[in-house]
Amino acid sequence: MALVDFIPVLFFAIAAVILQRDLYNKMSKGAFALFAAGTINVTCAGALKATWKLLYALGVCDFEALNAMFFPVQSIGFLLAGIGILAMLTHKQSKSAALAVVPPVFSGTFVFVGLMVAGLGIMDAVLCILAGKLKKPALIAIFILSFVCSLCMGYLSSQDFAEASMNWIAEGVNVVGQGTLLLGICLLRKNGLADYKIREEKAE
């Protein structure tokens, strides 16, 4: 089961790289920096937690710090990515870099869950908007499914399941969520996202 944790991390990492390549020429340096830093944070957080589970399963050690940093790093990462991709649509892009302000470290999980939901929601909403502009409404359903799966995974990951079957369900939901995200982004790319001109449309 520990190895399965790396599958959604890999899916998200591939999806993030594809988006970074396709959106690079559509973002200002500041917006792209926020988006890139956010997606890197999310990928690293997932990889570190998966590594913690693998080390624990193999009986090597219980490196709790890898698990403890998951929520703060991932939630702030989603928020930064969401702000960066939203800025691409809502603000006139310039060459100047943006200043990223993040909240101080907090021990509770409620704040981080809120940040994660907000950032992930913004990111999926912008992807739905892009799908609509490319006249591919079917992709909107894919991104909505990905968002719903991510919300379910967020709830499931906060529960303490004694049965292995429930952990497998949580892993399955996570794989489906990140898999649909990757599928949607690949289809956006296939349908011309890389060549889509956001600035020209706004100017018209």
Each PLM stretch: what is its role?
Residues 47:
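Conserved phosphate-interacting/catalytic interface
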Residues 1-40, 50, 54-69, 76-204:
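Polytopic alpha-helical membrane-helix bundles and their juxtamembrane interface segments
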